[in-house]
A protein has these predicted regions:
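N-terminal glycine-/charge-rich "phosphate-binding" loop or analogous flexible N-terminal tail
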Residues: 1-54
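C-terminal helix-to-coil terminal segments
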Residues: 2-4, 24, 102-110, 124, ...
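Short acidic low-complexity segments
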Residues: 39-51, 63-65, 184-199
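Phosphate/diphosphate ligand-binding glycine-rich loop within oxidoreductases
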Residues: 53-128
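Short, conserved loop/helix-junction motifs that constitute active-site signature segments
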Residues: 65-71, 86-91, 222-227, 248-253, ...
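Glycine-rich NAD(P)-binding loop of Rossmann-like domains
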Residues: 125-159, 186
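NAD(P)-binding Rossmann-fold cofactor-contacting core
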Residues: 167-183
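Rossmann-like adenosine-cofactor binding region
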Residues: 178-272
Length: 321
């Protein structure tokens, strides 16, 4: 277990580099440090990088060379996903990904909203092709007659699975290790993946992007997907082979999909996803970082470190999450 002996019992010097919102972030952080009477100080000048013990960092910030911070003991990401950070070869420090209650709630609500949108066939009423009063409808299944598969049962996936169970859907989850979630069937391994793909009316992707999960949704895996299933991806764009997904939609193998994450972001204006009538595109907004809540989560981890405890969300670099 990491103990971070350099900063236990000492004032912690923090450098903040969170992209366009760095100034706002530092103001909120300073207020929270004051309100919580924490023994921490924000280092404003990069020329004092050798004094820095901890870094709060976003992928879109201007910092790329972490060798500038030889005494930094930890890097806190402001995002849940860390695959981009881990590509940086100058990082030798432990990385802690963001685990935040409000972000988790946002993701669970977003996923549930899109499941309900399809389940209730709301698009046919919200976006009708003809402006007419049409009360005819196909009798829909009830929630307890619908099977949902959540791929990825980490913090976000587990919360989403619980939210959908509360709505009476039948929920199963697939992950690297078996998870115990009340009312949710936990599946693992290749057989578990085949089972969840073949039995789910809705597939929700909330996996981290690793060598094992890259393009996990491809031509081969789509062959076993239940005919007419709906796919919702709020994990990472790299989980999907785009061309194979489009073919599955064109053939009717998948009936619809909603995508919040993409292999290239922003999604290029000429990308086929924009023009496909079975694809809903949202611009990576399923679970945005909420400044005040995320800062409180990071400061709670800093308090843990100063007590000699391991931070929540410590990344295993070999696993990429």
């Amino acid at each position: 277990m990491l103990t971070y002996t350099k900063i236990i019992g000492f004032e912690l010097n923090i450098y903040v580099s969170t992209g366009p919102n760095t100034s706002e972030y530092k103001k909120i952080l300073a207020n929270e440090i004051y309100d919580q009477s924490l023994d921490c100080k924000i280092i404003e000048d990069i020329s004092r990088s050798r004094e820095v013990n901890a870094i709060i960092y976003s992928d879109d910030s201007e910092i790329s060379d972490f060798a500038l911070f030889p005494d930094s003991t930890v890097i806190f990401s402001t995002f849940a996903g860390v695959e981009k950070i881990l590509l940086n070869k100058t990082i030798s420090q432990p990385v802690v990904r963001l685990i935040d209650v409000e972000m988790t709630q946002c993701m669970a609500e977003w996923c549930a909203a899109h499941v309900l949108r399809y389940h209730l066939d709301l698009d046919s009423y919200i976006k009708p092709t003809k402006k007419e009063w049409n009360t005819s409808h196909k009798e829909r299944l009830l929630a307890d007659q619908v099977d949902i598969g959540v791929l990825g049962l980490g913090t976000l996936g587990s919360a989403t699975a619980r939210k959908l169970r509360k709505l009476d859907f039948n929920v199963a989850g697939w992950s690297a290790n078996e998870k115990k979630i009340s009312g949710v069937k936990s599946l693992v391994g290749p057989e578990g993946l085949t089972k969840i793909l073949s039995s789910s009316d809705y597939l929700i992707l909330l996996l981290p992007l690793t060598e094992r999960t890259k393009t996990i949704i491809n031509a081969e895996s789509l062959k076993v997907v239940k005919d007419g299933a709906v796919l919702i991806n709020a994990g990472r764009g790299g989980l999907i082979e785009d061309s194979d997904l489009l073919r599955a939609l064109d053939s009717g193998k998948l009936s619809e999909c909603t995508l919040d994450v993409f292999n290239e972001e922003p999604l290029p204006p000429e990308h086929p996803f924009w023009f496909h009538d079975k694809v809903t595109v949202t611009p990576h907004i399923s679970a945005p970082t909420r400044l005040k809540s995320s800062i409180k989560s990071i400061l709670a981890n800093i308090s843990r470190i100063k007590q000699g405890l391991q931070p929540i969300g410590l990344v295993e670099k070999k696993r990429s999450y």
